[in-house]
Amino acid sequence: MSNDREVPTLSQLNTTVSRDKDVSDTLSPDFDSKGSATGRDGGNFPMYIAINEYFKRMEDELDMKPGDKIKVITDDEEYKDGWYFGRNLRTNEEGLYPVVFTQKITVEKAPTLMRAKSTKRIYSPLTNEDPLLSSTFISENDSNSELPTPQPIETAASISRTANGKIERNLSLKNTMSDIDNALLEFKDDSIGPPDRFINSGRDEEHSITHETILSATDGLDVVESNSKPTTSSSTGFLNGDLENQATLINGIDTTKLNPVEAEFWSPEEITAYFIMEGYDVQSASRFQKHKISGKILLELELVHLKELDINSFGTRFEIFKEIEKIKEAIRTNGRSLNRASKTNNANIYNQLMPPANVDQRASYRGHVRKTSQSLEDLPSQQNFIPTPRNTRNSSASKHRPKSLVFDSQEANANIAPDVQIPQVVEEMAGNENLFVSPRRAPKPPSYPSPAQPPKSPLLNNTRTSPSPAQLYSWQSPTLSFSGPKRTSYIDQYSSSDSNFNSRSALPKNNQGGGKALSPIPSPTRNSVRNEDSEGKLTSSSKRNSVPYYGYAPESSSDRKSSCSSHEEEQFQETMNTFERPTSSIYADGSTIASISNDKLAHEKEGKKKPTRHSSSLSSKSKSDSRRNSSLKRSSSASRTSSFKKSSFMLSPFRQQFTDNAARSSSPEENPITSMPSEKNSSPIVDKKSSKKSRSKRRSVSAKEAEIFTETVKDDKNKRSASEAIKGETLKGKSLRQMTARPVAKKKQTSAFIEGLRSISVKEAMKDADFSGWMSKKGSGAMSTWKTRFFTLHGTRLSYFSSTTDTRERGLIDITAHRVVPAKEDDKLVSLYAASTGKGRYCFKLLPPQPGSKKGLTFTQPRTHYFAVDNKEEMRGWMAALIKTTIDIDTSVPIISSYTTPTVSLSKAQEMLAEAREETKLREQQMLENEEDEDQFLWDQQQLQQQQHDNNQGQADRTISASTQRTSDEDNTISTPNLSSANNTTIGSNGFSSPFLLASGLLSPGVARNSSMRGTEKKGKFSTEEDYFGDNSKHKTDKI
């Protein structure tokens, strides 16, 4: 194809072009169906594809559906608003569209027909152009368009039109062969450099995943250069001689090596390639690579888990789950076939140590993967054994748990050195095809240094000859895994047949006799201990990582002691000098290692006692052992040997205070069976009953507590009766056992804890007591009784005596953080009972602090104490004293208030207060001065008004007296009452005079008499009125 013109991205370009128009004009960026010249600018922008549907809301916008290719004409460089102007190549329309609805199609290399044909063909019926042009990813701008998923291209809606010619819906054979020929030519031209699929290896990983996972629609086109590793696809069809040695890569993975039997070791990329190879869509298959699903995780996936991988279609999830089940079945079938093949192989294979092979692995997919042990490749080269490394199909294989030892007939000769020998018992076990076909996988064989079987354990050989290279390898190689009854029968076989079987040796034969070195027996898993078929047989069990050095195991719950002879001790030291095991602290909670020879004693004990668990070469730690955190001390071999001679058991940190007498508390008389004819360093095996006695005698009791207890018991015996002394001794003994059975909690600095019960007389205790007196106290038992005691209070220490003649305190109560409350409604029965028995009518109680309180730690037992007294004054006195004592204010800690309003410091507040006081004083002085001025002004006004009022009053009085005299004179001279009443009424009318008022009767003479004159004006008015009425009166009298 020529590069001078633009190649179409999809077949849906410009379908409205007439037949006489050249196709090159249609595909040219200079051509625009609408005559717009803006199309010439579109060549500078990348191609976009619509990922969401958008309907235009205005005329100048552009409709697009998912999968539409958008040719950008103008971006938003001018406005920066996210709206681009482009052309939809499907509808050939131009307009504005939101760029967030589209995705950029990246460009990495000029298009090649080989790469274009490797993508999925999409042929559209919208054009009758050449199908080759319609099915390729095109143009310089979008040649290697890496789409997240190829589905949106297929879902692009089509525009219906009337076809001008017959539509070719299927690719013709001629075009297909032409495509193949062109691809071969381009392959020869590009053979110098790597294919373009590897160009994006260093680029965006998200884009490269889809780019590399697209399945070729034409077989044999996705090929690599000749120097890359040869691969082949499951659907490879060889085209010609040049492609016979070339294969199709899927996701960059060689599909020929994707064997479902090896699915456990697949990487996420290989899983993706496998499902693409099986015909699943790229989107679903790529989910395994996206979520990093390795082979081990794949085999553990269930149907519900596939939904978490964003595989939305249920049908696809179900088909993938069925494919996973097929892979599992292939693995199981291959494991059984390998076991059958090992049975029919030649005889010399049994003299070689086989590598791990595939077995029944269904259980391993359900659990977590154990940490990989040190492999054979990591062994030091100076051990005279260099194993052949196992050929792996990938150097960077994922870590996995090595399989148990089985005998693979196909890989044995190629991988194992012929001089490595195994014992005869392995040959017998190898013949049993059902040995490892069990619901559980056999335990992982640990490699050197093995934490489960230390090299220093004297399990090699009794001889003192230096070990041979085969013996060295037997210590370093993965040990043999025995399961179920085979393990037991193997040990029983040699314990019964070989009379020279040493108690500390697991080798049935020496080097000279048997000629085969036996690897040390591994510690099987914890739950594979029980042998239900034969109870009397010896079973070996232990946790994998819990076998300590010989002689250094902590005591189990039954306190079994391991025994050893002097010959075994010398051999043990020699073995430790030969092999040096690095120390490890994670395997510190080990189990007891008992001797195999003690099995006979255990069998003898069965006839006399109830059968117990037998000793074994690798005895497991008992479940009832509560000291799992005891750590084993690691030291040099010399110190270990010396400490081994001194004692046969290891003291844990919690038993450091035990003495030799405590350790030897169980005498031979108590345990007649446990003694053994051994050297002085051998210890007896103690049975359960005696071990309990010895443990109870070896409890952690401090000297101070023991002394206090002894003194208390002696004094109680002296001060009380015989029955009380016996009773008290029993109770004290019980409290001592409780104290020693569990460590006593740490006491704070309370006076009760510091001093304890004092030997002091009552009189001396009363001298410095805060309060003292007789009270009745309720007992603590179920049938509690009230007893009268003499109490003395010293701080928070409330002690009491049984009588005033006692020289030692009878009891003690620590009332720290207690509350003192009177007896309420719920305590009426207690109060009533105390009153009825004559112990006191007034009852109150002491309540201990709430559980969980930080101040709730007291020396005495926290419980409610009831007290009763005879009168109210005594109760108030005791309650007041107790309340004052229990008030606990810690002045060393600042008080934090819940008031959230911001405040100022104390010094600032004091300064502000002083200023405020000064301002207040000034303000008060000003107010006083102003008040004095106001008071003076008001006083002057009042005085002036008073004077005026007095003057007016005096004038009014004089006026009234004068008018009274005149009236009396007129009464004497005039006999008519109307005239006098008229004169009086006129006077009371404030100067208003009218004959009509008198005539109408509105004014009466009494008004003038009762009214007083107001002011000096009325005097003048009165005279005028008198003159007026005087003439009138004279005139009327004359008439009458």
Curated annotation (Swiss-Prot):
Disruption phenotype: Leads to the accumulation of secretory vesicles and impairs bud growth. CDD domains: PH_Boi, SAM_BOI-like_fungal, SH3_BOI. Keywords: Cell cycle, Cell division, Exocytosis, Phosphoprotein, SH3 domain. It comes from the Eukaryota. Residues 43-107 form the SH3 domain. Residues 1-39, 365-412, 437-478, 491-744, 943-986, 1007-1040 are annotated as: Disordered. It holds the Pfam family SAM_2. Residues 690-701 have a biased composition (Basic residues). Residues 8-17, 372-397, 459-478, 573-598, 654-684, 973-986 have a biased composition (Polar residues). Residues 557-570, 600-609, 702-732, 1015-1024 have a biased composition (Basic and acidic residues). The modification Phosphoserine is found at S18, S24, S28, S450, S519, S523, S546, S652. InterPro entries: Boi1/2_SH3 (IPR035551), Boi1/Boi2-like (IPR045188), PH-like_dom_sf (IPR011993), PH_domain (IPR001849), SAM (IPR001660), SAM/pointed_sf (IPR013761), SH3-like_dom_sf (IPR036028), SH3_domain (IPR001452). One of its GO terms (molecular function) is phospholipid binding. It is found in: Bud; Bud neck. Residues 495-505, 632-648, 943-957 have a biased composition (Low complexity). The keyword Cell inner membrane does not apply. GO terms for cellular component: cellular bud; cellular bud neck; cytosol; early endosome; recycling endosome; site of polarized growth; trans-Golgi network. Residues 768-887 form the PH domain. Its main location: other. SUPFAM superfamilies: PH domain-like (SSF50729), SAM/Pointed domain (SSF47769), SH3-domain (SSF50044). Present with 688 molecules/cell in log phase SD medium. Interacts with BEM1. Interacts with TOS7. Protein involved in bud formation. Functions redundantly with BOI1 to promote the fusion of secretory vesicles with the plasma membrane at sites of polarized growth. Acts as an abscission inhibitor during cytokinesis in response to chromatin bridges. This is BEM1-interacting protein 2. It comes from Saccharomyces cerevisiae (strain ATCC 204508 / S288c). The lineage of its organism: Eukaryota, Fungi, Dikarya, Ascomycota, Saccharomycotina.
